[in-house]
């Protein structure tokens, strides 16, 4: 996938791509550990910005990411002259970025710093690959509008030198941001999905486990464990770590214990009870149904769930809008949706099955 992305950039097929994957599916690891190192090998100067690093102020996230990228400059020390107003302080990114004291700076000062940093990176002469992780966060607050406009001002004039990978873990959040009329920056980006991990990944992890412990895992048991954690690599890696720690080879027993320890029962119960009955019915149909929620069959199912003779399309549309606004569902094709959280989908089915 990393080669494919870079090849598309290099042949001029596009200057911007959007990579979607639900949380904990390995998206950030792919970008940081695979894509960006490969880009550097191909002569790119790489920039990684995670807008969840500093959720309250994405400008800080952008400054931190750009500052970290200056370590790739042969004359990185010169950047200090441009940032003399920043004092060494206690802000540190999770990936070990530079320390900067940003607290108390005005928005204008931060935007000026962003422009200065970006200009300095451009003057290096290499092509830039900037990965903007969890970019959908920019659409969650009107106060973040200056960052959206700043990004447009940074990127648009330099499409011949700058390639962009937008990434996000909320399909609905990305769609809301990209469809905004006042954010044409994102409209030209082509979307790709992070491929799901399969048997090759499980065999690789089993090999790593054997090298670390001398113990052999049954591949069929690994497949079942992976299925139980909804094919989420993060959870599967946690299970492998627990198995290394506790000993033995019973990956299914460790998986069941892990799921019990990380149950979201209380959270899901509260979320479910806070939903309107029609929203609950729409969720159940989306999980169980074979068509979108607007068909006659779907609306009759929803009506039956509510104890009504019928429901109109507008009622269903309002429910869908609420669920999308709360990032509970996201469209996957015209008129069809899926839940953003597969664990929540399983919990709902179990809730309906037991009639609670």
Identify what each model region corresponds to:
Residues 176-227:
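Helix-loop-helix "sensor" segment of P-loop NTPases
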Residues 133-135:
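Walker B catalytic acidic pair
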Residues 266-356:
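C-terminal leucine-rich, beta-strand-based interaction scaffolds used for sensing/assembly
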Residues 137-143, 150-181:
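Sensor-1/coupling segment of RecA-like P-loop NTPase cores
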Residues 1-6:
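N-terminal pre-P-loop "Q-motif" helix
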Residues 207-267, 277:
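Amphipathic alpha-helical "lid/sensor" segments that cap RecA-like P-loop NTPase cores
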Residues 7-14:
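Phosphate-binding P-loop
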Residues 14-25, 29-129, 138, 144, ...:
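P-loop NTPase nucleotide-binding core
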């Amino acid at each position: 996938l990393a080669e494919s992305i870079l090849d598309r950039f290099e042949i001029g097929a596009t200057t911007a791509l959007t990579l979607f994957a639900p949380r904990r599916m390995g998206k950030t690891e792919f970008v940081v550990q695979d894509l960006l190192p490969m880009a550097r090998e191909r002569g790119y100067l790489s920039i990684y910005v995670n807008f969840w690093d500093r959720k309250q102020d994405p400008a800080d996230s952008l400054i931190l990411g750009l500052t970290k990228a200056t370590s790739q400059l042969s004359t990185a020390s010169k950047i200090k002259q441009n940032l003399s107003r920043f004092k060494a302080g206690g802000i540190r990114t999770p990936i070990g970025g530079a320390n900067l004291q940003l607290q108390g700076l005005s928005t204008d000062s931060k935007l000026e710093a962003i422009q200065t940093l970006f200009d300095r990176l451009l003057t290096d002469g290499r092509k830039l690959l900037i990965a903007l992780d969890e970019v959908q966060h920019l659409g969650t607050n009107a106060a973040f509008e200056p960052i959206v406009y700043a990004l447009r001002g940074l990127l648009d004039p330099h499409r011949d030198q700058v390639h962009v990978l937008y990434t996000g873990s909320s399909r609905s959040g990305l769609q809301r941001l990209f469809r905004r009329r006042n954010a044409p920056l994102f409209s030209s980006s082509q979307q790709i999905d992070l491929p799901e991990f399969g048997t090759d990944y499980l065999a690789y992890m089993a090999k790593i486990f054997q090298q670390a412990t001398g113990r052999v895992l049954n591949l069929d048991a690994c497949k079942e464990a992976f299925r139980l954690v909804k094919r989420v690599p993060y959870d599967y890696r946690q299970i492998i770590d627990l198995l290394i720690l506790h000993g033995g080879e019973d990956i299914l027993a460790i998986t069941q214990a892990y799921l019990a320890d990380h149950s979201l029962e209380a959270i899901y119960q509260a979320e479910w009870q806070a939903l309107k009955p029609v929203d609950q019915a729409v969720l159940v149909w989306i999980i169980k149904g074979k068509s979108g929620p607007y068909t006659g069959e779907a609306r009759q199912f929803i009506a039956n769930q509510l104890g009504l003779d019928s429901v109109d399309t507008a009622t269903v549309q309002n429910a869908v809008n609420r669920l999308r606004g709360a990032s509970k569902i996201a469209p996957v094709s015209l008129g069809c949706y899926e839940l953003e959280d597969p664990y929540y989908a399983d919990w709902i089915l179990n809730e309906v099955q037991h009639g609670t």
